[in-house]
């Protein structure tokens, strides 16, 4: 079965799933909420080289397991992949880090191609992709850095986002091949400009177009304000202007570079869902973004907090 056929089947299944599960199609998609609504039990635990697994409902309640050793965006993609197995009627499936030793996607069986295509379309429907671009102040992605920033609003892995942009007809195959050579770690370090970041943390670049939007973040993430003339007002509980102190951070600066003071803030575990961060410009205009911290995902999903 070709990838084109897999995407064709997945697009139909995704459209049905979005409607049946009342999932957003023009914003960040809550895949874990969708799994709960469809009756799939979800658990998280460290799984080594395993991405996750799906257990069909032939012996009882269907369930899936996600690897909490992965960063949040990779867990979200894995969860959407397992939801694809469920919605497309596949049997129990174990998903490893690499489906084959060759080129990505080469030699994958039909059900894995369908589930992978489902995951991309479920998390990145066209309206959601356009909304993410708009919040970046973009009409189209013009560089790997644009894709990295776009993926922060979608909650998706960098490489997966690049591949899906071809399906959305926002880039061509030649551009895809070039952009896939870029490491997301290098891209986030470039955007951070020396600001400290842990290995699984991300940098969220907040442009004027992000005003009044909702941003999903993880503890350790950095919010870099790039609204001209703006500085953060009083930071809510769960945000700090003090850089994280981690032994393996990407930068070992003990303080925030002077140009970024008042424009950089880090997320902590104390952030309450629905917190709003505001900034005021030199002309007294107010910029705000609503923040939602993703929970820890160890154990059964009903205990995540």
List each language-model region with its residue ranges.
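Active-site hotspot residues in diverse enzymes, especially metal/ion-binding acidic/histidine motifs
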Residues: 1-305
């Amino acid at each position: 079965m070709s990838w084109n056929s897999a995407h064709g089947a997945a697009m139909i299944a995704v459209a049905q799933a979005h409607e049946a599960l009342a999932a957003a199609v023009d914003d960040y998609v809550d895949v874990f909420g969708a799994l709960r609504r469809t009756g799939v039990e979800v658990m998280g635990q460290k799984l080594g080289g395993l991405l996750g697994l799906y257990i069909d409902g032939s012996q009882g309640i269907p369930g899936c397991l996600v690897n909490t050793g992965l960063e949040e965006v990779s867990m979200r993609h894995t969860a959407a992949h397992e939801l694809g197995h469920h919605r497309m009627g596949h049997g129990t499936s174990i998903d490893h880090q690499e489906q084959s030793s060759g080129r990505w996607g080469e030699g994958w069986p039909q059900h894995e191609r369908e589930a992978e295509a489902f995951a991309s379309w479920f998390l990145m429907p066209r309206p959601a992709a356009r909304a993410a671009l708009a919040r970046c102040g973009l009409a189209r992605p013009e560089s790997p850095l644009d894709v990295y920033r776009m993926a922060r609003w979608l909650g998706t892995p960098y490489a997966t986002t690049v591949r899906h942009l071809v399906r959305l007809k926002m880039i061509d195959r030649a551009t895809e091949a070039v952009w896939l050579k870029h490491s997301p770690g290098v891209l986030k370090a470039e955007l951070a400009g020396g600001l400290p970041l842990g290995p699984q943390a991300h940098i969220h670049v907040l442009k004027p177009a992000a005003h009044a939007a909702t941003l999903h973040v993880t503890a350790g993430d950095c919010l870099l304000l790039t609204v001209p003339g703006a500085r953060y007002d009083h930071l809510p509980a769960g945000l700090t202007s003090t850089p994280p102190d981690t032994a393996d951070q990407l930068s070992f600066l003990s303080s925030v570079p002077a140009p970024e003071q008042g424009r950089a803030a880090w997320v902590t575990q104390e952030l309450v869902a629905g917190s709003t961060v505001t900034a005021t410009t030199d002309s007294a205009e107010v910029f705000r973004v609503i923040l939602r911290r993703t929970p820890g995902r160890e154990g059964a999903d009903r205990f995540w907090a």
